[in-house]
């Protein structure tokens, strides 16, 4: 639900107490033209907590439990953590370079660089290293008495040269080796020891995570309070302050009581033309989960109705239809229950995690329900006469369609019987629906009517849901766009007429018993009437510019057809699941099980991606086009940030105003 926001002016003397009390109440966003940036101190707190999070992921909690020194300040802890982390990163870069150097000089073998330098100083004889490209049929030893073969590695031959030897430059390349591999390995061990010592110290400092987190909360609260005070304008040599702010209307009485307590004058003022009224949404349950989805795309404008609940239920439906498998839904539900049990402690203090797991469970239930109606379970094929399929929604609709065909004998029935003459003699709807085609060698190959009916029903359901979804959006936005009445009439009329134009039978005929010919005629004239009504209503609302509304017919038509993606993605997922099952069945049990497991894993990932992307897209693109302005900004009232550790100790449930 979107709550109304009004602009108020506050005038008074007691600035400090007023802002502190306003922060506790949390219903006012004070208006300022100043731009505030994140300070270096706040950034240091965040970086320190990131280091602690990395330690928590790398080590067990038992390894991070150490005795704390209560005399250490938070600032000293943060400084030491950041210094140690910086040093560790520098040492790791040195280790990386050292490993590369070890690989480079390893073929030269172990030697003492100091002894070589001493030998060169006393005798004047230099020792140098060379390498050349290795060739299988070439002798490794050189004829020169001062050239010694060392080793072959990385497809190169390595040599030691004493003194000055004239080697062919086109074949031999000198390699610099100021230090040997054994000396570098000693340096590497020393560096790793230093890294380990610093890492151990970081683990010791992890015990102060709660203090650092509390320090960040306190610092952030002080910064927010300071920024709110900076919004004020001082009057009468600083004796009086004045500040404007956006206020949640439902909390006006509480704010008025606060102002009376601190002798603050409060008056509603008009909104400036260039100001954008912030949007404040307040939801619970599924509405809050829908709000999380809405915030992914855009913040509703102040003039918009809250679409959270609508978006949530539509997303669950679209996601379930796209995944189109009860088995996958069962996995989603079980995963949600498993993670809910594993993170049950965190869920008490993290509303976001709790809502995400609940949404996963609801999506799993939706997939189970829709997969049951379409008899889809891990891509397995059920017999057309099985009880599981007989009571499914698609089977019931297909049977009603068969009854309509035999009773009314429409044009589509005649085309079907001309293609399969054996169907003419069948009078029982169930036998007609389950009629099979006789292939070569007298083998029944497929159900010619059943398969065709099921595909048509699923495709039409996607279009039907699209018409209903868009119509609901237009009805919600009717006060801002009168032409929506005309376009609703156009879509409903088109749904009546198109089956007649295509010579097929629709849900509205065999399920809602709409007369075939009469419905088509009404739909034909209703389409033109809907377009005309949309243009007339647009002209009433927008004067002569409403004539442009006529070109929206293409947009409306394409938006309805866009819902076919639900059918296409659901069909693709079902076909992939069935294909992996068939592939696995042809292989030995172990190999076939691996193929089926990997295949369904890939299909689940693709189904989730398709369900999330296209399930949200149909809401954010097609539906929002007729029921959403967007471009708003969320209300950010001055509120006190609650540290998760403090909330845990006091039993407070965290919301958006918390740092975990």
Swiss-Prot record:
Gene Ontology biological process terms, A to Z? vacuolar acidification
* InterPro entries named among the record's database cross-references: V-ATPase_116kDa_su
UniProtKB keywords: Cell membrane, Hydrogen ion transport, Ion transport, Membrane, Transmembrane, Transmembrane helix, Transport
Q: Where are the transmembrane segments?
A: 312-332, 362-382, 453-473, 485-505, 520-540, 560-580, 593-613
Q: Which GO terms describe its molecular function?
A: ATPase binding; proton-transporting ATPase activity, rotational mechanism
What membrane topology term does the record carry?
A: Multi-pass membrane protein
The entry's localization annotation reads: Cell membrane
For this record, the Gene Ontology CC terms, alphabetical, are: plasma membrane; proton-transporting V-type ATPase, V0 domain; vacuolar proton-transporting V-type ATPase complex
The entry's function note states: Produces ATP from ADP in the presence of a proton gradient across the membrane.
Q: Which family does it belong to?
A: Belongs to the V-ATPase 116 kDa subunit family.
| Name by which UniProt lists this protein | V-type ATP synthase subunit I
**From what organism does this protein derive?**
Chlamydia pneumoniae (Chlamydophila pneumoniae)
Q: What is the lineage of its organism?
A: Bacteria, Pseudomonadati, Chlamydiota, Chlamydiia, Chlamydiales
């Amino acid at each position: 639900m979107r709550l109304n926001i009004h602009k108020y002016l506050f005038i008074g003397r007691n600035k400090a107490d007023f802002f502190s009390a306003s922060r506790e109440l949390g219903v006012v966003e004070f208006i300022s033209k100043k731009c505030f940036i994140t300070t270096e101190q706040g950034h240091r707190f965040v970086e320190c907590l990131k280091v602690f999070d990395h330690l928590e992921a790398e080590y067990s909690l038992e390894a991070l439990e150490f005795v704390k020194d209560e005399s250490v300040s938070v600032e000293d802890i943060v400084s030491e953590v950041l210094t140690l982390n910086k040093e560790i990163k520098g040492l790791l870069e040195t280790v990386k370079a050292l490993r590369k150097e070890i690989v480079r000089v390893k073929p030269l073998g172990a030697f003492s660089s100091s002894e070589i330098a001493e030998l060169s100083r006393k005798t004047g004889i230099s020792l140098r290293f060379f390498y050349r490209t290795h060739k299988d049929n070439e002798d490794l030893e050189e004829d020169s008495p001062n050239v010694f073969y060392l080793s072959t590695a990385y497809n190169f031959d390595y040599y030691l040269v004493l003194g000055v030897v004239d080697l062919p430059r086109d074949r031999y390349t000198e390699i610099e080796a100021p230090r040997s591999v054994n000396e570098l390995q000693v340096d590497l061990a020393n560096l790793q020891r230093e890294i380990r010592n610093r890492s151990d110290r970081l683990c010791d400092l992890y015990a102060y995570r709660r203090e650092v987190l509390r320090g960040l909360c306190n610092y952030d609260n002080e910064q927010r309070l300071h920024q709110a005070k900076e919004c004020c304008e001082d009057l009468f040599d600083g004796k009086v302050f004045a500040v404007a702010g956006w206020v949640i209307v439902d909390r006006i009485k509480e704010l008025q009581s606060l102002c009376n307590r601190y002798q603050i004058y409060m008056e509603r003022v008009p909104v400036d033309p260039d100001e954008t009224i912030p949007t404040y949404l307040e939801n619970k349950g599924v509405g809050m989960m829908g709000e999380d989805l809405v915030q992914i795309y855009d913040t509703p404008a102040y003039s918009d109705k809250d679409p959270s609940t609508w978006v949530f239920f539509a997303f669950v439906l679209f996601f379930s239809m796209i995944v189109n498998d009860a088995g996958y839904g069962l996995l989603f539900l079980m995963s949600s229950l498993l993670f809910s049990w594993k993170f049950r402690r965190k869920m008490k203090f993290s509303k976001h995690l709790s809502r995400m797991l609940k949404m996963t469970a609801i999506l799993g239930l939706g997939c189970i329900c829709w997969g049951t109606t379409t008899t889809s379970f891990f891509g397995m094929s059920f017999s057309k006469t099985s009880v599981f399929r007989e009571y499914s929604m698609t089977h019931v609709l297909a049977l009603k369609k068969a009854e309509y065909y035999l009773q009314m004998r429409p044009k589509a029935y005649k085309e079907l019987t001309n293609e399969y003459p054996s169907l003419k003699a069948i009078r029982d709807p169930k036998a007609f629906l389950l009629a099979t085609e006789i292939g070569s060698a007298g083998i029944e190959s497929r159900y010619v009517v059943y398969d065709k009916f099921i595909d048509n029903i699923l495709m039409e359901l996607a279009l039907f849901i699209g018409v209903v979804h868009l119509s609901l959006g237009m009805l919600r936005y009717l006060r801002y766009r009168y032409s929506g009445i005309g376009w609703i009439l156009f879509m409903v009329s088109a749904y009546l007429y198109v089956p007649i134009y295509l010579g097929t039978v629709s849900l509205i005929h065999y399920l809602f018993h709409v007369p075939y010919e009469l419905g088509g005629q009404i739909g034909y004239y209703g389409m033109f009437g809907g377009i005309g009504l949309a243009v007339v209503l647009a002209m009433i609302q927008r004067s002569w510019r409403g004539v442009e509304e006529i070109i929206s017919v293409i947009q409306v038509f394409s938006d309805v057809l866009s819902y076919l993606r639900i059918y296409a993605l659901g069909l693709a997922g079902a076909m992939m699941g069935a294909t992996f099952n068939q592939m696995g069945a042809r292989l030995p049990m172990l190999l076939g099980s691996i193929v089926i497991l990997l295949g369904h894993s890939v299909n689940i990932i693709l189904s989730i991606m398709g369900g999330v992307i296209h399930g949200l897209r149909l809401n954010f693109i097609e539906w929002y086009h007729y029921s959403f302005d967007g471009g708003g900004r969320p209300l950010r009232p001055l509120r006190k940030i609650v540290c998760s550790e403090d909330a845990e100790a006091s039993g407070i449930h965290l919301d958006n105003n918390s740092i975990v």
